[in-house]
């Protein structure tokens, strides 16, 4: 979970010239639909994906066997530049559930931007597989892969967006509050990163008011902020950003945080801990902030004690973290079904 990158990277595709094949040409076939962020989904499309995830969860938990196997005989590739627990297991599980064969390709397995350009690697892998789950470092990498892939690219995390987690979180909230999200309030206490970028958009599209508390000096990129404000105005939801966790928590039904120190930021640990002083979620904070009586806690994991106290994280009545983690599987199934099996037709 890395801080948002600059608008120039968001608004322009950056194509690396290193090792670029001069003879490469774009295919004339119709371009597939990709999942990059929550910004690209309509309100109805997001709702449909969440509902399909809930459906598959009910089927699996009921012990019903998926006999359709729509991806039978097809390979689903997972290109991961970063290590992962939930994303890898859920993506491979989703492919297997739909009858496909998952193929994991880590940074030590392929020549991803090292001895071969990202352009050439994407062209080759997409010619052999049905789809690509891409967990990469830079948002520009996702943009470049989408530009040159002949199959759907599913953003499994980049430094700006995390759409699979956002779909998961809306599913978790919906099933925890009487199968509805309308009129709820979500409080985010933590960093400005890829998780809240997509969760904020998804929540506002789902009828959830959003209040965000971040340390002084941290800012959202304008593309995210302007998109969130536009959605808020259109959908009748509210967005508030503050530096005070107690202010954000006031009246919140859902309290969410995430890691403060992402992969690759380990050298910044001491600086980060100082920056986030007073941001650990405790029951005292929740009480002082006057959260709603039915408040629940969420965290996409992995979790560290400085982010949230054990009394909150392991509270079986309040904490949804393990249900949330399991729901990653059903979100991945819904996305794979929607973007690969149904070729991006979500409604």
Swiss-Prot record:
Alphabetized PROSITE patterns for the sequence: CARBAMOYLTRANSFERASE
Keywords assigned: Amino-acid biosynthesis, Arginine biosynthesis, Mitochondrion, Transferase, Transit peptide
EC number annotated for this UniProt entry: 2.1.3.3
Span of the transit peptide along the chain: 1-25
A molecular-function term among this protein's GO annotations: ornithine carbamoyltransferase activity
PANTHER family for this protein: ORNITHINE CARBAMOYLTRANSFERASE, MITOCHONDRIAL, ORNITHINE TRANSCARBAMYLASE, MITOCHONDRIAL
Family, similarity comment: Belongs to the aspartate/ornithine carbamoyltransferase superfamily. OTCase family.
Protein name, as recorded: Ornithine transcarbamylase, mitochondrial
Protein's gene: OTC
């Amino acid at each position: 979970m890395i801080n948002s990158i600059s608008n120039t990277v968001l608004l322009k595709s950056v194509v690396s010239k290193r090792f670029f094949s001069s003879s490469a040409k774009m295919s004339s076939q119709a371009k597939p639909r990709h999942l990059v962020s929550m910004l690209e989904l309509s309100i109805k499309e997001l709702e449909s994906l969440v509902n399909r995830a809930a459906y598959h969860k009910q089927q699996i938990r009921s012990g019903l066997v998926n006999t359709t196997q729509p991806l039978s005989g097809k390979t689903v590739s997972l290109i991961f530049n970063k290590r992962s627990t939930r994303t890898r297991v859920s993506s491979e599980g989703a492919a297997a559930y739909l009858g496909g064969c998952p193929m994991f390709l880590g940074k030590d397995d392929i020549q991803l931007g090292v001895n071969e350009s990202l352009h050439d690697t994407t062209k080759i892998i997409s010619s052999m597989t049905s789809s690509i789950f891409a967990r990469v470092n830079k948002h520009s990498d996702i943009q470049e892969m989408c530009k040159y892939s002949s199959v759907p690219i599913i953003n499994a995390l980049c430094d700006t967006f995390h759409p699979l987690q956002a779909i998961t979180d809306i599913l978790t909230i919906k099933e925890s509050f009487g199968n509805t999200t309308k009129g709820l309030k979500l409080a985010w206490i933590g960093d400005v990163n890829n998780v809240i970028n997509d969760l904020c958009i998804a929540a506002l599209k789902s009828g959830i008011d959003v209040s965000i508390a971040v340390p002084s000096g941290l800012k959202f990129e304008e593309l995210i902020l302007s998109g969130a404000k536009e959605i808020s105005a259109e959908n009748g939801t509210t967005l508030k950003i503050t530096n005070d966790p107690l202010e954000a928590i006031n009246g919140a039904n859902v309290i969410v945080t995430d890691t403060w120190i992402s992969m690759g930021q380990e050298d910044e640990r001491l600086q980060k801990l100082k920056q986030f002083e007073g941001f650990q979620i405790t029951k005292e904070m929740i009480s002082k902030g006057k959260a709603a009586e039915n408040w629940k806690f969420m965290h996409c994991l992995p979790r560290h004690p400085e982010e949230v106290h054990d009394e909150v994280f392991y509270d079986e009545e309040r904490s949804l973290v393990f249900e949330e983690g399991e729901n990653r599987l059903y979100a991945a199934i819904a996305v794979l079904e929607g973007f690969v099996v149904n070729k991006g037709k979500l409604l």
